[in-house]
Amino acid sequence: MGIDLSVIWFVIIVFATLMYIVMDGFDLGIGILFATTRDAQDRDVMVNSVAPVWDGNETWLVLGGAGLFGAFPLAYAVIIDALAIPLTLMLIGLIFRGVAFEFRFQATPSHRPFWDSAFLGGSVLATFSQGVVVGAVINGFSVSGRAYSGGVFDWLTPFTLFCGLGLTIAYALLGATWLVMKSENPLQDKMRHTSRALLLALLATIAIISLWTPLAQPAIAARWFNLPDLFFLLPVPLLVAVIGAWLWRDLRNPARHALPFILTLGLVFLGFSGLGISIWPHIIPPGITLWQAAAPPQSQGFMLVGALLIIPVILGYTFWSYYVFRGKVQHGEGYH
């Protein structure tokens, strides 16, 4: 049996996407949490907690997009055509977030509120757009032959908008628990209270999406509820409940600093796993599989050589930067 390059590339793209969600998720979450405080010192601590590492987080988004373009060109073409508007809005949000992140440090006191608002708005827009994209992927795409045949606004449904809200809550929880780990009181205590409210909202959102999805998509319902698959997949929602209860308990314990963030990562991973289980083996639901969308094996093999060289470098840089800038961030500290 030969090596299945399509599966390997799917794993690489999934890994890059998950790394992006984890790394840039709490970064965007901090921008979203600007809505919870107007205190200038608290906002400085929030931004300084990610200032040394945020530049490299979007590398994973570039890797995932480039991998999709090269390894699954049909999937890339359909997704770009079907989701042109939300993807464009996401990029606009990321640009605003990035520019505001840098400019707020250089701005005069009278101009800083503008850049703070741009940071908040860009973070919300980018996050909400990503959630809409996730919802649209779950809904599936109309494809005729090898081209997208749906409408310009097929992505715009109540379900996709709710997914946008859900991802916004998830990123905000990532950001809040990151600040529990990286900040000190009184900001840390405030983020504990905020995290508890966000956790309840996220668990409710997960429950609604978990019920809404199989009701709207019979194929996904069959995947999750038919025997014997039900027995193998049942641990996923059970783990969500267990981790949610564990996280709630630790957020009430002032001695716990890092564990709430780790548990939140677990919730994000389980949600991401649920998405993968629901659509596998389709890369363009409901009808195009990995192998139907794949590039020629020669192209995938050539790209794989480069990926195997660059991914360890990205991982090494990422872990080193987080190691160097570990520890708490205090008022008055900064990296600009």
Q: What kind of region is each of these model predictions?
A:
Residues 284-303:
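Short, membrane-exposed interhelical loops at transmembrane-helix boundaries
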Residues 123-189:
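Long hydrophobic alpha-helical segments that form multi-pass transmembrane helix bundles
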Residues 132-147, 211-220, 276-287:
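Membrane-helix interface motif
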Residues 158-170, 234-237, 301-314:
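Hydrophobic alpha-helical transmembrane segments
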Residues 53-125, 138, 144, 223-231:
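Membrane-interface helix-loop-helix modules in multi-pass inner-membrane proteins
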Residues 7-11, 111-126, 193-198, 255-265:
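Alpha-helical transmembrane segments and their helix-start/interface "positive-inside/aromatic belt" motifs
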Residues 28-52, 70-79, 102-113, 175-194, ...:
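Juxtamembrane membrane-water interface segments of multi-pass membrane proteins
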Residues 1-56, 62-65:
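N-terminal signal-anchor module of multipass membrane proteins
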